[in-house]
């Protein structure tokens, strides 16, 4: 699995990536990382589908984007990617829920909490993000299976009123 770690403190990047690597080794799942010192650096290089999850420090460098604003901009690019906030303070917890994070990890991150979070990520990613539906192109034509992103579904209506 490929993770992005957005953290301005090198020692926190190394600590978190080490814990993730340990947990993945126990589970027999390979893990690799791309680390970014700022929200701006991360967003400049972000490509949808490149990461399975983003670990994002809320209290990034005061001169740039904080983690909440980085997450807001990220959500414009990818609605489904799991965001896990890391923080030493809970002051922004309520504001952070606006971007629908998968989890919050309080620093210093505890290995057992991280193990639970990584399992949560795997379960989240196991849910399909796309359906395949048959679409007919005309009378008598064989239906063709087309992918439909779950993010594109606004509502579903069932004209059948009886069960």
Where is each model-derived feature located?
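Non-catalytic signal-transmission and effector/linker regions of two-component phosphorelay proteins
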Residues: 1-4
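Acidic di-acidic motifs
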Residues: 7-9, 88
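Two-component/phosphorelay signaling modules centered on CheY-like receiver
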Residues: 9-34
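Acidic, metal-coordinating helix/loop segments flanking the phosphotransfer/catalytic sites
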Residues: 17, 32-53
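Short, charged helix-to-loop "capping" segments that act as catalytic/coupling loops
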Residues: 23-31, 57-68, 72, 137-143
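CheY-like receiver
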Residues: 44, 51-129
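Conserved binding/recognition cores within well-folded domains
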Residues: 116-163
């Amino acid at each position: 699995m490929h993770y992005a770690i957005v953290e301005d403190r090198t020692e926190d990047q190394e600590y978190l990536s080490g814990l993730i690597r340990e947990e993945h080794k126990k589970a027999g799942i390979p893990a690799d990382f791309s680390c970014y010192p700022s929200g701006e650096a991360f967003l400049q290089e972000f490509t949808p589908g490149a990461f399975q999850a983003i670990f994002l420090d809320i209290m990034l460098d005061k001169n740039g984007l904080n983690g909440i604003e980085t997450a807001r901009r990220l959500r414009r690019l990818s609605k489904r990617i799991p965001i896990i906030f890391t923080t030493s303070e809970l002051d922004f917890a309520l504001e952070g829920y606006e971007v629908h994070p998968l989890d919050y990890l309080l620093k210093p991150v505890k290995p057992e909490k991280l193990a639970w979070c990584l399992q949560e990520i795997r379960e989240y990613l196991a849910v399909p993000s796309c359906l395949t539906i048959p679409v007919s192109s005309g009378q008598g034509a064989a239906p063709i299976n087309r992918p439909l992103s779950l993010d594109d579904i606004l509502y579903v209506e069932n004209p059948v009123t009886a069960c």
